[in-house]
């Protein structure tokens, strides 16, 4: 009996030893995987896009997809058609609706177009509108009307999406049954961002995770969820918004709101060690407004009257001197905030951008990569 017991004991010891070895192999494999995951996590640059609503953050994300992922597939382009049609509908509804509410109100150039306005206001505003051919006909004819054009020119007096003119100019293409949106159409298309969206891409074998968060006031409470382990903040401001007010608060100037928001982020105690890359966006629209001369920057920012173009200003060939002065004034308004309360732990790096211009964003992002790399090394105390 003792011999049998002894053999069973040896077998049991052998099984136990194998189990222990197997558990150790599994444990070692888990440890190696965790170590690998940690290395990948630490090697990833996490970029947080912040800024007020309609500043161009989501357009920056689209550019990263075009430049560093695979752009947009045919099915994704087709899916955007409904959003683009909605942009056209929102634009013509808003403009024709504003004609009678402006002070002084604006009349149609052709009184016979009133029936077209009535159609747009009565039928196109419905929730189940299906964009019949007459909608496009009415929209095209109204967009040619001088009264509608004058109302568009006063769009800073009401809320109108930036892409209104772009898509209203292209109704004849978009209404075609075989229409497929171009990259520029997708970049221009406006869709409200609600929540947090992550885009992952790789540049020269370096991993980037970019987080886009809604910029409207009621969306900003979600920002705190993204602050952990951020490599850098990209703050986006719409420079062309100097003569506009917020959708959510018609008493607040949009550019001043952006400056206030930048100040709150810059002075946030949780972000004191995170540097900010400042995208002074919508330079194309800013230049249009300044050159048109109808909305003077000094009417909204009295300090501009005394402002002189700084010595470090870089001028592009043929650039209007007043446009140069305006864009550097806005830059310096932000830098005044960062230099007033900077403690040497984080820095502000300004760049002039046009988010719908792929070459511009490619050049700017390449310029930023060295900055982001330094921030990443400092984040893990390697610099």
From Swiss-Prot:
Domain of life where this protein originates: Eukaryota
SUPFAM superfamilies: P-loop containing nucleoside triphosphate hydrolases, Transducin (alpha subunit), insertion domain
Parts forming coiled coils: none
Gene Ontology biological process terms, A to Z: adenylate cyclase-activating dopamine receptor signaling pathway; sensory perception of chemical stimulus; sensory perception of smell
Biased composition (Basic and acidic residues): 18-31
Lipidation (S-palmitoyl cysteine): 3
Entry-linked CDD domains: G-alpha
Compositionally biased residues, Polar residues: 8-17
Listed GO CC annotations: cytoplasm; heterotrimeric G-protein complex
Region (Disordered): 1-31
Positions with a binding annotation for GTP: 51-58, 187-193, 212-216, 281-284, 355
Region G5 motif, residue ranges: 353-358
Region of interest (G2 motif), ranges: 185-193
Residue ranges, annotated region (G1 motif): 46-59
G-alpha domain: residues covered: 43-383
Keyword annotations from UniProtKB, A to Z: GTP-binding, Lipoprotein, Magnesium, Metal-binding, Nucleotide-binding, Olfaction, Palmitate, Sensory transduction, Transducer
Binding site for Mg(2+): 58, 193
Gene3D superfamilies attached to this UniProt entry: GI Alpha 1, domain 2-like, P-loop containing nucleotide triphosphate hydrolases
Oligomer status and interactors: G proteins are composed of 3 units; alpha, beta and gamma. The alpha chain contains the guanine nucleotide binding site.
Family: Belongs to the G-alpha family. G(s) subfamily.
Protein name (Swiss-Prot/TrEMBL): Guanine nucleotide-binding protein G(s) subunit alpha
